[in-house]
Amino acid sequence: MDFIDFDTFTKDASGSDNDVFPQPQPPLSLPIASNLDQFSKKLSNLVLPGNILNNDNTKPSNEISEVDNVMEKYAKMSIDLIKRETGDVQLENEEDSKESSVRTSLSTRLSRVLNDSLSDATIREIFSNLQERFDKESNGYVVDLIESGIVGSMSRKKFKGRIESELIRNQSNILKQYQPIVKQLKQIEVKLNKLNELSVQTNDKINKNFDFSNKLNLEIKDLNDNKRLIGLKKNLLISFKEKFTLNEYEEFVLNSGDLNNEFFTTLARAERINENCSILLSLDNPQLGLKIIAKSNQMINRSIDRIVSYTNKTLGNMYSLSSKSRLATLHQCFKYLQNKLNYFNSIVNTFSESRSKVLVDEFNRQVQGDFEVNGQGRSSSISSDSRPIYMSAHDPVRFVGDLLAYVHSVSVNESETITSIFTMGDDNDKEFENIIQDVTDKILQSLSRPIKARVEQIVSTETKLSTLVQIFNLVELYNIMFTKQLGKAGNIVETVKQLIKVCQGRIFMIISNRLATIKNKNSTKLDLNLDLQPPEWIIEFYSDILPIVDQITTETILNLSPEENEKFLNLIVNEPIQVFNEHVDHNKVFSEKKDVLIIKSNFLDLILSKTIPVSLLSEKVLEVNEMIDKLTEEITQLELNNMLGQCGLYDYFNIINMICPFSDDFFEVSIYEPIKENKLYTKDSFVQVDEKVQEFFPSAMIEMQQSLLKLNSPIVVNQIIDNSFMQFVKFYCKLDLINKEYLDFSFTWSDMEIATLVGIEDVYSKDISIM
């Protein structure tokens, strides 16, 4: 806070220049009007010094209106003008001058305070503190404080001193709070000084020791570098020797040692040396690498030759494989050579060719007996008590069975031998599985052609179906056995499958040839006569074939494919029917159509009776039944036409069906009204028809049964009789209704009476009730 100095108000207030108080500087213009407005609002309740001095002459600003202010202003101006004119205004001017001087000085001070860059909150706090202090003092103290004389100046200086002492007291209290900390800091200062002295001494010693240790470290570093370099050279030489050279003992093992684990370990090391020499070839001088490679290659090739020679020698003598140690060594040789296919394939081919030759020679001796074409003795692998397989003209089935059994035993022995060679009896060893299959197939391939030729020779000369089927069953059985033993891709398995096709084709050929012979043979054509019975050849044909088919338990005959099975069924069922129909159609013995239908029906009935027990022919049974049903319908129609002709109703039956065919579902008499226009449709004609009906039907059943005596199936006979009489009675009933409508005529016998005469009243009654 700025205080008004005493010197400001010490001068005398007279009319002269020396007696007048010095005028203050004009008030500062506040740059921001809004701030002055705000301060005026804040200080609205503050009492100005002028107001304090002139309490009697002024009023609060909030009680004076604007009009009153204007009036007061003009009134004062009028009074001042009068006083000047009368000369009485001198004293008032002096007082106004003093008051104006005080106000001007105070305004200057306030402007300086208010124009300071203080925030509103700070100013508010300052005035609040002043207000609190003024509230504690007496009213006269505030008046003395703002007094412009010596008293005011002294009051303000005292007030300023009080504020300063209070400020010093507050600052002293704050400093007293930091006094313990200052003491601690002084104690720390003493300790730090001691530490600094120790630090200086220590640094001096360290600097001296550092110079000495630097020299020592340099000497140690030189020694370590020399040691490391010497060790590196030593390690390089040792590593080079281990990586690129063989010692004398290892060379001895490869050149002259036994083939064992040590040999193969040393050989693997020699191969690694050979591979690692590629690094030496990248040097500026590759001569060292070339020399090492040449030497290692020489030793490796010599070792491989020893392995190949040992393997061929061991495989050439099968008895040597009884030694487990030799077999283990052979197994190691195979493991090593399996990555060198040229050597391995050469060994496998040599072994396969030698074993194939032995098997073929042994097979020929077994088939041909002790006789040898080349004059050579028996093989050492064949025992002296072995039984040769002789070809028997009377028992080809046994020969084929023995032949296949021998080949199967040979294949099993060879497969087990080769498996034991490559796996050493360990069934879980699958490393050489494909090789075992390949070698076994190559060895047994030599037997494929001889066995195929022998079996084809027997099958091609055999004419009995039963024998061929037995041979087929044997071949199929051994196909399963070979497949289980050798897999599905073996050459022997393919050969056996071809033999199955040969047997199937031969059976097809024999049946086809037999049917062709029957078709073209005159005796079979002449076998047809008026007794209308099936020919003997069909009985003989099925007596050979059906027992064979009946024994089959597979889904198809002879395990044929669905297409081939359908062809075979057509061959044994449809082809005989076709041949028989051709014979009947070209035979002039049968003059009546009814006889042709009956003999065909009897033939189909025989085939049906033969094929029903055979489950594989169930589809053909249905097909034959359909053929019989068609023939039955034709015979039924013939019998119906015969009855209509006997009764004189045949023409009327045709006329009515021309108008609208009869139907069990719908019948309306009015539909048949056009029949009246027909000339044959007269009452006299139906009188004659009625007489014929009465004359024919008492014996109609007996006559029809006699005409169907040659039909073998009683079921078909009953079906023909019932259906023909049923159709006639239905026609008879409907015709009687038409006659009643358009001729006023009815038959003597009703439809039920006719049905009773022929014994179908029950069936007819049920049919009427359904309708």
Curated annotation (Swiss-Prot):
The keyword Membrane applies. Coiled coil: none annotated. The keyword Lyase does not apply. It is found in: Golgi apparatus membrane. Its main location: Golgi. It holds the Pfam family COG6_N. GO terms for cellular component: Golgi membrane; Golgi transport complex. Keywords: Golgi apparatus, Membrane, Protein transport, Transport. GO terms for biological process: intra-Golgi vesicle-mediated transport; protein transport. It is a peripheral membrane protein. Belongs to the COG6 family. Acts as a component of the peripheral membrane COG complex that is involved in intra-Golgi protein trafficking. COG is located at the cis-Golgi, and regulates tethering of retrograde intra-Golgi vesicles and possibly a number of other membrane trafficking events. This is Conserved oligomeric Golgi complex subunit 6. It comes from Candida albicans (strain SC5314 / ATCC MYA-2876) (Yeast). The gene is COG6.
